[in-house]
Amino acid sequence: MEIINGPVLPRYAAPATGALTSDAKISGQLLRRVHLRRRACGLQGDHYRAARRFFGFPSERHARSGWVWPVCCSYGSSSDGDGAAAADYDASGEEFVNSSVMEAVELRSVSDGFVIKMRDGKNLRCVQNNPRVLRLRDSAPHHAIVLKMEDGSDLLLPIIVMETPSIMLLAALRNIRIPRPTIYNVVKEMTERMGYAVRLVRITEMVHDAYYSRLYLAKIGNEEETISLDLKPSDAINIAFRCKVPIQVNRRIAYNNGLKVVQPTPSESYVSSDQFQCTRLDRPDDQPCFEAQEFDLVRNMLVAAVEERYKDAAQYRDQLFMFRAKKKNMI
């Protein structure tokens, strides 16, 4: 693996001064026309304020409750917003590495690193690949989507997400049939009906502890005509997995924020005479198995959420919280 030293330096696309001047002139002309028409028709001030929010300058359009556009789109072959050509999205492919999705459930911080809990109940102990980067100051578990780098480094990139995208991705990984279509299935079908196909998803940069990703679409029959969308990584990864397209990660992000899996400590494992690595085995006894009870609650909650039985899922969630609190008090 080629190691890139130094901090992550995200690139920002500085808008041209001429574009800002042109935008200001157009906004001012539209605003003056609306103002004159308001006076001629006798409209009230609320209509004028609404027009200012729509046709005014960016500071006026987005001043209300910090509202911003949820999706940014670049069309054509000029630029995708970060300096790379939108149509030729493989031009800077050397900056990215392919990755695969792991069946991870949650991520939590411990004293000596991190622990990734997998769907099958296994825990992966990890340490930061770059010790200078500090993340996850609290020890509470977080829902996470984990990407594994496919360049031979085996680095893991955890992305903290909300509960619903994590459950939807696990359902897709396990081929669990959901009775009603999800938003990701709707986006996939809508894209195909518009004559486009999803080609690629990239995790491009990290700004203020938030990952940025882009979804690349290409016109079917004309690969030169592309659309680049700015999406949340959780949504972009869900769409990419369902469309079976590559998921790429910026190499600097993988190096600076990736985790390395460490071997279990000697107290947790031993090597038998036949040289097989054996871990501690669960042995039946007369005591209740808390791990099995916790696993049953988690499984029932996930199944209920996937089947859209949200009331049952909420009940299982409350039972799980009470069970974990009781277990913590017993320790």
From Swiss-Prot:
MF (Gene Ontology) = nuclease activity
Which residues, by range, are in coiled-coil regions?
Answer: none
Q: Which PROSITE patterns match?
A: BFN
Keyword Transcription belongs to the record: no
Q: Which domain of life is it from?
A: Eukaryota
Subcellular location per the Swiss-Prot or TrEMBL entry = Nucleus
Enzyme Commission number(s) from the entry: 3.1.-.-
> What does UniProt give as GO cellular component?
nucleus; VCB complex
Which PANTHER family does the annotation name? BIFUNCTIONAL NUCLEASE 1, VON HIPPEL-LINDAU PROTEIN
What family is it from? Answer: Belongs to the bifunctional nuclease family.
Protein name in the entry: Bifunctional nuclease 1
What organism does the record attribute this protein to? Answer: Oryza sativa subsp. indica
